[in-house]
Each structure stands twice: as structure tokens, then as C-alpha cells.
Amino acid sequence: GTTVCIGRSVGAGDKKQAAKVIGNTVTLFMVGSVVLAAALVGLVDPIVRLISTPEEAVAGTTAYLTICFIGIPCITAYNVLASIFRGMGDSRSPMYFIAAACVVNIGLDFFFMGALRLGPAGAALGTTLSQAVSVLLALCVILKRKSIRLSKSDFCPRKATMKDILSIGLPVAAQDGFIQVSFMLITIMANQRGLTDAAAVGIVEKIIGFLFLVPSSM
């Protein structure tokens, strides 16, 4: 929803409205992400049981999910920044940020999982820290451009602005949510069959996610 709302404002030459959209997006999603992260960290044990994690993988799964849940604000911050870039007509910069994050992620995975032998926790640390890198890169670029100036008042919640963002964004979120729920159900069924089946399904889901990149970018 943010990308569309910013695009409309920029297209109309209304930088003040674009600033309000950006400020309200930051307020809405960053506060929401912190609350969500705290809730999920508190529920990590029930979640691990809910998805029927094989006994031998419980400890690793718990560590992995805990670190990933703590990193939710980083994921949210990057997505907010990426939507701002795209709303201003720049789809290349987010691609560069993600490319850099992927390189960092691979390097950190080798370090944490290979050198330090941290296992699943190391993989989660690599992912979370690489996401933080993408956020820092995006922030540096967007602060240098100064194409849209923000004031403190832009971060004050405005009902009309948030309604516009959510009215466009919620249907898209619901669409993605349905897909993720179906994958979650498949994961639960695979976990119930044992560690080998769970690993196989995990690999296939990664491949499917890669194949979906092209149609999802249309």
C-alpha cells in the first residue's frame, strides 16, 4: 500500500502528502513489528510444537525461530524503505541492497555455521544481521538523496493516511498470507512424517519460492 500511495503523491507533485505517507508507514509498521516480534518470541515454544517439529530438531528450530523473530523489525524496516524507493520510481536500489545482503548472508553463514559451528542459530544470525546491513545501506542512500523532507509531524498517526495504506496493502497481504498458510500446513504434515521428509519439503519450498520470483514481480 505504501508504494502505491507514495507513487500517487509523487506523481501529483505533492511532496507533503508523500512525506505524510512515509512517516505514517514508519510509525504503523515499525511499532507493529516490535509488538509482533515480542509476541512471537514469547510464543516460540508453542509454535514449535504446533508445527509438529521432529524431536531431534526441536532445539535447533527453537533457536532459529527465536533469533528470526527478534529480527522481524529489521525485515520490516527494509520492506518499508524498499517500498519508499519503489514509490519514488526507483526499483533498482532495493535490488542492489538485497544483492549486498545476500553476499553478506553467505559469508556470515560460512562463519557462524562453519567456523563457529553454531548450527541453526548461526544460520538465523547470518540472516538477521544481513537484513540489518540492507537496512543500513538503504538508510544511507535515502538520507543522502533528501528528495522528500520529513518532519516530526509526518510521523504522527493520521487516520485517513493509514486507511489509504491499509486499504491497498491488506488485500496483497492476505493473498501472500494464504500462500504461506498452505506452505505451513504442508510443513506440518512433513514434520509429522519425520526429519527426512521435513528436510525434503524444506528444499522443495525453497525451489518453489525461487520459481515464484518472476510471476510475483509482474
For the regions a protein language model found, what residue spans apply to each?
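Small-residue-rich hydrophobic transmembrane alpha-helices
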Residues: 1-38, 75-94, 201-218
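Transmembrane helix-bundle signature of multi-pass secondary active exporters and lipid flippases
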Residues: 1-4, 68-75, 163-218
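Hydrophobic/aromatic residues in alpha-helical transmembrane segments
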Residues: 2, 43-44, 81, 108-109, ...
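Hydrophobic/aromatic residues within transmembrane alpha-helices of membrane transport systems
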Residues: 6-11, 18, 47, 70, ...
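Short alpha-helical transmembrane segments in multi-pass integral membrane proteins
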Residues: 6-73, 115-170
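Hydrophobic residues within alpha-helical transmembrane segments
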Residues: 27-31, 35, 70, 96-103, ...
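Short runs within selected transmembrane alpha-helices of multi-pass transporters and secretion channels
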Residues: 67-86, 94-102, 123-136, 216
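Hydrophobic transmembrane alpha-helices of multi-pass small-molecule transporters
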Residues: 105-110, 134-139, 210-213
